[in-house]
């Protein structure tokens, strides 16, 4: 069934900033998709087109991206009468029309909005759930429910505290199914709230952009200690492990790292990549840390390689790889990390996201699907993670509706699959392993 009409508009993300929403119409109905937006963005990401008109939304309007859809992309796609199930053809057409390496003409936010809506329409056209359509597009015969990685303590660019490292996550790998993983996550979260309240006072339990707590602590180890305590109080020491997103590019300073980067600058306190690696190794030794994302700057390739070779845990590339097949190929070649963070808006189309995922999986990497800090109520990534069988997703704490929207969709998918539902559990790094 071909596209009858496409209409884009400006809506608001979870931070009150404008973002792109796309309505796509076929004879089967209306299909709507909204595009997320990141705060700590890698310099190699596809371009998110903003208006830069300082008199409107502090320059963050997306009316240009919306106009590119309504005036250029929509007429082209409608006139070509392509079937909505032809995801790759439609994505390629938009990418060719844009003609730039990083989608800077139309904006990745314009192309992605249409791409997501096409994917949703394609599923209905085929009469299958969205996760099944995505599995088909990726060539997967089975589907898998992921382990959720709940970001329960926020620091870095996501929070107004002193904490340098951006996310401290809990992964309920010992759960029997996704529903139990949600219950464990929620119970640990509420225990953590009480632990923080007792130690730092009630105002320390205000939440950050992704629903995690942002107590005013400086020591990253204290974040891990709080998690360990909360996991123990909830009674899940044997079922929950810890993940971190350091987002080290945010505090990389001329070859070194500043773990107090939110204070006035003082080069005497900077530490070397080796010192930072030793700090991570002490965390791994003292706490159940099984995954560290962006431990070093996006161009500090040597430090990545050295750490991945010796750490013995999952090392996730986000700013390093930016869901870009060229960066992933380089990281595979240099053995820089062993897991890809998959963010659809870093690359800007469904087809390229699938290619990035397949490339990582083909090289023995894990893949973690991810939200952005500026989110919407759109639940596409919940179906994406199931269809791609990546086994792990991070989409915030069990708090704030734009985060829960994804987790709740995963609950529905598990329920729909019934006895056929398979949960990644402790195999979250390689859930397809037989």
Swiss-Prot record:
According to the UniProt record, activity depends on pH as follows:
Enolase activity is lost above pH 9.0. Immunoglobulin production stimulating activity is retained at pH 13.0.
Among the entry's GO cellular component annotations, what is one? cytoplasm
- Mark the residues carrying the PTM N6-acetyllysine: 5, 60, 64, 71, 89, 92, 126, 193, 199, 202, 228, 233, 256, 281, 285, 335, 343, 406, 420
Superkingdom field = Eukaryota
Which reaction(s) does its UniProt entry say it catalyses? Answer: (2R)-2-phosphoglycerate = phosphoenolpyruvate + H2O
Q: What else is known?
A: Used as a diagnostic marker for many tumors and, in the heterodimeric form, alpha/gamma, as a marker for hypoxic brain injury after cardiac arrest. Also marker for endometriosis. Antibodies against alpha-enolase are present in sera from patients with cancer-associated retinopathy syndrome (CAR), a progressive blinding disease which occurs in the presence of systemic tumor growth, primarily small-cell carcinoma of the lung and other malignancies. Is identified as an autoantigen in Hashimoto encephalopathy (HE) a rare autoimmune disease associated with Hashimoto thyroiditis (HT).
Q: What is the native source organism of this protein?
A: Homo sapiens
Segments of this protein annotated with the region Required for repression of c-myc promoter activity: 97-237
Q: Identify the residues that bind substrate.
A: 158, 167, 293, 318, 370-373, 394
Q: Which GO terms describe its molecular function?
A: cadherin binding; DNA-binding transcription repressor activity, RNA polymerase II-specific; GTPase binding; magnesium ion binding; phosphopyruvate hydratase activity; protein homodimerization activity; RNA binding; RNA polymerase II transcription regulatory region sequence-specific DNA binding
Q: What is this enzyme's class at the first EC digit?
A: lyase
The UniProt entry, under PROSITE patterns, shows:
ENOLASE
Give the residue ranges for region: Epitope recognized by CAR and healthy patient antibodies.
31-38
Residues found modified as N6-succinyllysine:
60, 89, 228, 420
User: Which InterPro entries does the record cross-reference, listed alphabetically?
Assistant: Enolase, Enolase-like_C_sf, Enolase-like_N, Enolase_C, Enolase_CS, Enolase_N
Q: Which residues bind Mg(2+) 2?
A: 245, 293, 318
Q: What is this protein called?
A: Alpha-enolase
